[in-house]
């Protein structure tokens, strides 16, 4: 007690705990941070299982910041999906530039597996169904785009071998679908190594094509 006034050193302003300061970022840096956090959460929990609150908390910001950059969870998800689709499409189509058809098949199969290995979260997002994906693009639509390019390659090969080039779209869908489904399986098992998986895919696809019958028939009798 001093001069009738109680002195409490514990209430000194210098002793009060300080709150952690929010890291200052530019608009572009904050947007990228939110995209990275959203990408991770969408891969782990899916679109429905992820909330704006959780995204904001992970970023250390308030919910309005997420809305300011993307308009909401749907907008953020759409941007994430679009970026992953571009990444995968660029990788696979870049492998279909030039070379012998077998080499092109090898390169395309390896490119898909390489994407899965390098961008696992992105691939999980692409293959997971979401209502939002219906308007932003789906894995099925991406595979269809790739099949269209494979169709052109097969069309030339069919002409050279005397097969009907009108059937190229059917075979293109079958080939790309085979590689895509195998990729989804390999996403979880990761065995054998991607080079070996690609080799086996090409082995089945190429030797199957190499031994094609010009007019295949079903062994059993079918009316339709």
Predicted feature locations:
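Hydrophobic alpha-helical segments that form the core
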Residues: 2-10, 164-185, 196-208
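Amphipathic alpha-helical packing segments from all-alpha helical-bundle domains
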Residues: 86-89, 135-159, 169-174, 196-199, ...
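Amphipathic alpha-helical segments used for helix-helix packing
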Residues: 115-137, 151-155, 181-188
